[in-house]
C-alpha cells in the first residue's frame, strides 16, 4: 500500500519541483555567487532567450565599486562600454548576426576587480529583443525579473562544505584539532598494545 502511494506521489512531487525551479533557471544570471574582496574575478553572465524572438542586445551595469577590466570576445557580438554620471560603468553586448534564438542561451565572460570590502554586488541587466521590447532584470530576490547577486566576502573568509562561512584561522584551528585527535588516538592505541604485551609476558 505504501509503495503504491509513493509511486503515485513521486511524479507529482517531481512535477511540482520542476514547476518552481524552471522559471529561476531562465533568469539572466551572473556567476560566481560569491567572490573575495579585492580580487580580480572572472565573471560569467548567462542570458537565455525566453520569448519566440531573438535577443539582440544585453546591457549589464557594473555594481557599485566593481571595476570592469576586460571581456572575452565572442563571434557575432560587438562590445562597448559607457561611463555614467554616477561613475558607474555599463557594458553592452550587441549582436552582429542572429543573436540569441528562442530555446538558446549565451554566456558572456568578463573580468572585474572586486571592491576592497565585503558587500553585496547587484548586477542590473537589460535584455533587448528584436521587436524592441526590453526585460529589465533589476528587481529584488522575490521579483519576477530579479537581478543577480554576488556576495563579496572578506579576503580571509572561506565557505565550508555546509555553506557556513569561516575564516582561514578557523580552518587552521580545525586542522590542528584533527591532528591533535589523531595523535591522541595513536597514543592510546600504543598504550593498549604495550599493556597487552606486558600482561602476555607475565602470563608466560
Curated annotation (Swiss-Prot):
Keyword Membrane found: yes
Q: Which GO terms describe its cellular component?
A: plasma membrane
Q: What Gene3D superfamilies would the database entry show?
A: Uncharacterised protein YcnI-like PF07987, DUF1775
Q: Which residues form the signal peptide?
A: 1-26
Q: What is the effect of changing residue 27 to A?
A: Decreases the ability to bind Cu(II) by approximately 2-fold and abolishes the ability to bind Cu(I)
Point to the regions of Basic and acidic residues compositional bias: 158-168
Stretches assigned to the Cytoplasmic side:
200-204
Q: Hey, which stretches end up on the Extracellular side?
A: 27-178
Q: What is known of its domains?
A: Adopts a cupredoxin fold. Employs a monohistidine brace motif to bind copper.
Q: What does this protein do?
A: Copper-binding protein that probably plays a role in copper homeostasis. May act as metallochaperone, possibly to facilitate copper uptake via the CutJ/YcnJ importer. Preferentially binds Cu in its oxidized Cu(II) state in a 1:1 stoichiometry.
For this entry, the protein name equals Copper-binding protein CutI
Organism of this sequence: Bacillus subtilis (strain 168)
What would be the name of the gene that encodes this protein? cutI
